From Swiss-Prot:
Keywords: Signal. Belongs to the UPF0482 family. Residues 1-29 form the signal peptide. This is UPF0482 protein plu2232. Coiled coil: none annotated. It comes from the Bacteria.
Length: 120
């Protein structure tokens, strides 16, 4: 038993040095040399498929950005229209002209006698 333990203790440093070398053997064998042909599969992530996917993603982003811009412009236009109608209603209601009244369906300030639009 004592002999077995001494052999293990003597062999342990050699085994500790040999294991990393065995680990590196496949890596050293796989390196490309100047006279050999090397094929790298997805080596740096710059493949044609990746470029195409990036192009399609950018194209989709640009299309959705254009649609968002159109939607935002339309919403802003509707808001401005609504805001102008509120301002026009307020000025019509505050008008000193006693014949002026606000028509909610047409959103205009009308003369109650003639029905014609007026500027209060």
């Amino acid at each position: 038993m004592n002999i077995c333990n001494s052999l293990i203790l003597k062999a342990m440093p050699a085994i500790a040095l040999a294991i990393p070398l065995l680990w590196q053997t496949p890596a050293l064998a796989a390196t490309c040399t100047s006279g050999s042909t090397c094929v790298t599969v997805n080596g740096n992530g710059d493949s044609v498929l990746d470029k195409e996917a990036a192009r399609q993603s950018k194209e989709q982003w640009n299309e959705t950005k254009n649609l968002r811009t159109k939607v935002n412009k339309r919403a802003e236009k509707e808001f401005d229209k609504f805001d102008k109608a509120i301002d026009a209603r307020d000025t019509c209601m505050k008008s000193t002209n006693i014949n002026a009244y606000w028509e909610p369906n047409t959103e205009r300030c009308l003369d109650s006698n003639t029905g014609m639009p007026i500027r209060p």
